[in-house]
């Protein structure tokens, strides 16, 4: 597993000012996001947890997975959650030519339309940003759970979420994927409870 920032350093949004790194509302809130789904069983479990706590979230969906599991995608939408484009084939922008990357984004737009996009791995070139910024709102994050990291425990995943005090308008990332499942399903309800107990609400981006 390569090096990654659990919390976004202050200078990174300065390099990519056209991207969304946090929410922008007055109340004490957190934006909860999930990447890489939908998955026929894992996403369903996530929806059950969110329903239990009456929380809404963003799901950044891989177009190919939406084609495979359309009913699961429909269930996300039916439950009042927001969906976003996560490319059709989960492309790494740093390893993909801009023309191919944009075409992959557009292929997902043919499957479902969304106002929001998150680049897989958070890796996108300046050229790709320039090509896409008029087509979508690009959403990054302020805090990673690290649930995708095979080298950490589920307890460490939870610690990543709550060790440093939460700040209003933060965007946090989990994954509704097989690789992340064990850590995500352990940490998610505990993180939600922690946030609610500390006076935060969960909001959707506008």
Where would I find each of the regions flagged by the language model?
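Acidic-and-aromatic substrate-binding clefts and catalytic sites of carbohydrate-active enzymes
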Residues: 37-41, 60-69, 91-99, 118-125, ...
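Charged helix-capping and loop-helix junction motifs
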Residues: 71-74, 98-105, 153-159, 185-189
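His/Asp/Glu-enriched short active-site or ligand-binding loop at hydrolase and phosphoryl-transfer sites
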Residues: 123, 129-165, 199-206
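Glycine-enriched alpha-helix->loop->beta-strand junction motifs that scaffold or abut catalytic
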Residues: 53-55, 78-83, 133-142
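N-terminal pre-catalytic segment of deacetylase/amide-hydrolase enzymes
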Residues: 1-32, 38-52, 68-71, 189-206
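Active-site groove signature of glycoside hydrolases
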Residues: 29-36, 171-177
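Catalytic grooves of carbohydrate-active enzymes
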Residues: 162-206
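CE4/NodB-like, metal-dependent polysaccharide N-deacetylase domain
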Residues: 47-56, 60-61, 81-82, 88-91, ...
């Amino acid at each position: 597993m390569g090096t990654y920032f659990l919390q976004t350093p202050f200078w990174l949004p300065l390099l990519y000012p056209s991207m969304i790194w946090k929410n922008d509302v007055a109340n004490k809130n957190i934006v909860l996001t999930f990447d890489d789904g939908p998955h026929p069983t894992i996403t369903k479990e996530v929806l059950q947890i969110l329903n239990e706590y009456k929380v809404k979230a963003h799901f950044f969906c891989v177009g190919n997975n939406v084609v495979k599991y359309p009913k699961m995608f429909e269930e996300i939408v039916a439950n009042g959650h927001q969906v976003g484009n996560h490319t059709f084939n989960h492309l790494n922008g740093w390893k993909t030519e801009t023309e191919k990357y944009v075409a992959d984004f557009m292929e997902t737009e043919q499957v479902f339309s969304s106002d929001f996009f998150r680049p897989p791995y958070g890796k996108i070139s300046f050229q790709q940003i320039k090509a896409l910024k008029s087509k979508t709102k690009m959403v990054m994050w302020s805090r990673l759970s690290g649930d995708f990291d095979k080298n950490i425990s589920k307890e460490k995943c939870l610690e990543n979420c709550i060790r440093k005090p939460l700040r209003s308008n933060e965007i946090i990332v989990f994954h509704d994927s097989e690789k992340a499942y064990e850590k995500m399903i352990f940490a998610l309800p505990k993180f939600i409870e922690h946030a609610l107990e500390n006076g935060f609400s969960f909001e959707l981006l506008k």
